[in-house]
């Protein structure tokens, strides 16, 4: 570009984010084929993977339409080189990404046809969406945390109650030291506290910085692209993301249906478990549905699963169903069952990130070798130990949670939403089709957000939530009485429904 055009004539900055595309050449016959598309895609992925924010190029005049369709814009400067006429072109990478949606199907098809030898992935890695839009209102630089009082964060499933007073007192008493001191390398005290509370041996416990840490660590060790996995649908989105996008293995879905209240048909599931999967994932209670399989039924089901099939049971919300409903003791004696427990949602510790696996020691041995030192921070270890030492406090909060959920369900039904029964700290709702101004879940979520009420569009949390007779689904976390009232009023006002 510098050879033909002075930089001051170009309407963009020459900085470290600017890249020039040059010499992307294919034969004339291939210019409107997949070859040209693949070459452009590879160039854009190179720029994107290296942190580029804008591209510029000189494009031949006779194929200008092809560049424009791809998302490039003409600067309005014509360049001649010999007998060939060119146009100066540019585009932001954000615009190119937005335009690439129109070619997504074609590009996905190309991935299976090419031998990709470049040092970055064929597709831009995408994370799993988990909600948390309320931080857009609070601010992610944490300089306006007082704004949290102005909003209701019901789009993620954090506890509505604070941690045990024991947790707060211990952290406050020792906070400077806790922040400046390295934690025990292997979390020995935390492991012992968990094992004692759950009635298992320390060798049955593997700690982690929340359940996501454990999912990524375990699944990438156990599975390959040739593996086969089974998940519920709908269920917690991280599982499909890790299995399909990170590992790339085959994933089958056990569909749950609204006509059944999204309950799991154990007889059908038992048949599915005989198909020789490498991994089966069961979230119990399930999210976003809230449905729950009783302990005795689940243990009977899992007792007949072939030993070559690992079964991962996510019990993040099981305390809301009753502490006696956990299958941790069963998993500790099992050859192939692993329980994953987050301490975020039921102990009000989402901010410090602590969780663990409970399983037979032989299943955790290899994962223990892959666990980095200091995997759980010192404040998190101390908070978790103190929380486990105060079961009475949390048991009382779980009782209150059921009461608050019942009140929230009644309020949501009163403004026209259909609610599904569940045992967790959240409510899954279906919007009825037609009849009111706000017709779909995405619109409802956006309008509630403008009122400082953040709820989750659940329509993308499973294939079973993307259709049906209604206008979509939302998942709403249980808040305290005041927060629940704001949620109900926000939904009512956003839908235009009568008081």
Regions found by a protein language model. Give the residues of each.
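Conserved acyl-donor/pantetheine-binding loop and adjacent beta-alpha core of acyl/acetyltransferases
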Residues: 1-31, 86
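Conserved PLP-binding catalytic core of the aspartate aminotransferase-like
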Residues: 402, 414-451, 467, 474, ...
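PLP-dependent enzyme catalytic core of the Aspartate aminotransferase-like
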Residues: 296, 450-451, 461-499
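PLP-dependent aminotransferase-like
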Residues: 221-282
């Amino acid at each position: 570009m510098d050879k033909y055009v002075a930089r001051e004539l170009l309407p963009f900055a020459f900085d470290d984010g600017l890249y020039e595309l040059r010499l992307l050449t294919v034969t004339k016959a291939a210019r409107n084929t997949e070859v040209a598309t693949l070459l452009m895609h590879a160039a854009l992925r190179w720029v994107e993977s290296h942190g580029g924010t804008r591209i510029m190029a000189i494009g031949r005049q006779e194929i200008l339409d092809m560049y424009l369709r791809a998302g490039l814009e003409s600067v309005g400067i014509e360049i001649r080189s010999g007998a060939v006429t060119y146009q100066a072109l540019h585009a932001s990478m954000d615009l190119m990404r937005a335009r690439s949606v129109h070619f997504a199907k074609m590009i996905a098809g190309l991935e299976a046809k090419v031998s990709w030898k470049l040092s970055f992935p064929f597709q831009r890695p995408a994370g799993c969406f988990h909600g948390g839009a309320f931080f857009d209102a609070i601010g992610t630089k944490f300089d306006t945390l007082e704004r949290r009082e102005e909003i209701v964060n019901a789009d993620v499933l954090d506890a509505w109650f604070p941690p045990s007073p024991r947790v707060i007192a211990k952290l406050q008493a020792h906070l400077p030291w806790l922040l400046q001191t390295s934690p025990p390398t292997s979390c020995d005290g935390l492991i012992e506290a968990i094992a004692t509370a759950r009635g298992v041996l320390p060798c049955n416990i593997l700690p982690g910085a929340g359940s996501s840490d454990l999912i990524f660590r375990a699944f990438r060790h156990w599975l390959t692209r040739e593996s086969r996995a089974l998940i519920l649908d709908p269920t917690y989105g991280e599982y499909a993301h890790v299995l399909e996008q990170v590992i790339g293995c085959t994933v089958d879905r056990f569909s749950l249906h609204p006509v059944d209240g999204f309950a799991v048909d154990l007889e059908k599931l038992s048949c599915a478990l005989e198909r020789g999967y490498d991994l089966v994932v069961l979230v119990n209670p399930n999210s976003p549905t809230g449905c729950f399989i009783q302990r005795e039924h689940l243990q009977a089901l899992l007792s007949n699963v072939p030993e070559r099939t690992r079964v991962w049971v996510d019990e993040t919300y099981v305390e809301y169903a009753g502490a006696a409903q956990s299958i941790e003791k069963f998993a500790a004696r099992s050859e192939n069952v692993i329980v994953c427990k987050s301490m975020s949602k039921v102990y009000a510790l989402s901010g410090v990130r602590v969780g663990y696996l409970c399983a037979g020691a032989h299943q955790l041995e290899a994962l223990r070798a892959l666990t980095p030192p200091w995997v759980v921070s010192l404040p998190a270890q101390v908070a978790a130990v103190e929380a486990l030492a105060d079961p009475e406090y949390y048991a009382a909060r779980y009782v209150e949670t059921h009461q608050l959920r019942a009140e929230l369900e009644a309020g949501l039904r009163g403004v026209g939403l259909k609610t599904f029964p569940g045992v967790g700290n959240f409510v899954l709702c279906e919007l009825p089709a037609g009849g009111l101004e706000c017709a779909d879940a995405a619109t409802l979520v956006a309008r509630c957000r403008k009122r400082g009420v953040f709820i989750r569009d659940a329509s993308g949390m499973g294939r079973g939530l993307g259709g049906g007779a209604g206008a979509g689904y939302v998942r709403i976390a249980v808040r305290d009485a005041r927060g629940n009232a704001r949620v109900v009023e926000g939904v009512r006002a956003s839908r235009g429904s009568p008081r």
